[in-house]
Amino acid sequence: MRIGHGYDVHRFAEGDFITLGGVRIAHGFGLLAHSDGDVLLHALSDALLGAAALGDIGKHFPDTDPQFKGADSRVLLRHVLKQIHGKGWKVGNVDATIVAQAPKMAPHIDAMRALIAEDLLVELDQVNVKATTTEKLGFTGREEGIAVHAVALLLRA
C-alpha cells in the first residue's frame, strides 16, 4: 500500500466560472492556468502520481507544452490513472480539501465526488471532497485564489 499527497494553487483571473472536480461553477472570476485550471483534479493527480512514485503533473503535462493548453483536467486525471494501473496499483481511496473563501463549495461537492469516482473507476464511498475557508486570512481568505490538498491511498491491483 502507498500514500501520496498533492497540493495545488491557482490564482483568480478574468472570467465568469471556475471548474473544480470537473464541475463548472459560476463565479465572478476564472482561474489562471495553462490547462482548464481545475485545481482539485491537479492536486488529486499529484497525490496519485506521488503515491506511485511517478513524479508530478508538471512532469507528465508540462505547462510549456502547447498540447496541454486549455486541457480538460478530467482527461489528464484518467491518463494518470492509466499510469498507476500500469505500475500495478489501484486506487484505495482519495480525500481532498478545497481551501477557498468563495465561491461556496457545498452545493457542488456531491457532483465533484461523482465525477471523480467515475474517472478513477471507483465507488463513490472511495472519494471524499470537503471545503473550508481560512477565515479571511492569507491569499485564499483575500479571495485571490484557491488551494487544494489531496491524499491518495493506492493498493496493489
From Swiss-Prot:
Pathway per the UniProt entry: Isoprenoid biosynthesis; isopentenyl diphosphate biosynthesis via DXP pathway; isopentenyl diphosphate from 1-deoxy-D-xylulose 5-phosphate: step 4/6
GO BP: isopentenyl diphosphate biosynthetic process, methylerythritol 4-phosphate pathway; terpenoid biosynthetic process
UniProt enzyme class: lyase
Swiss-Prot/TrEMBL site (Transition state stabilizer) positions: H34, T133
Keyword Lyase: yes
Keyword Magnesium among record annotations: no
GO molecular function: 2-C-methyl-D-erythritol 2,4-cyclodiphosphate synthase activity; metal ion binding
EC identifiers of the protein: 4.6.1.12
Keyword terms, alphabetized: Isoprene biosynthesis, Lyase, Metal-binding
Record note on cofactor: Binds 1 divalent metal cation per subunit.
PROSITE patterns reported in the protein's UniProt record: ISPF
NCBIfam families, per database record: ispF
Record's subunit section: Homotrimer.
PANTHER family for this protein: 2-C-METHYL-D-ERYTHRITOL 2,4-CYCLODIPHOSPHATE SYNTHASE, CHLOROPLASTIC
Protein name: 2-C-methyl-D-erythritol 2,4-cyclodiphosphate synthase
Record gene name: ispF
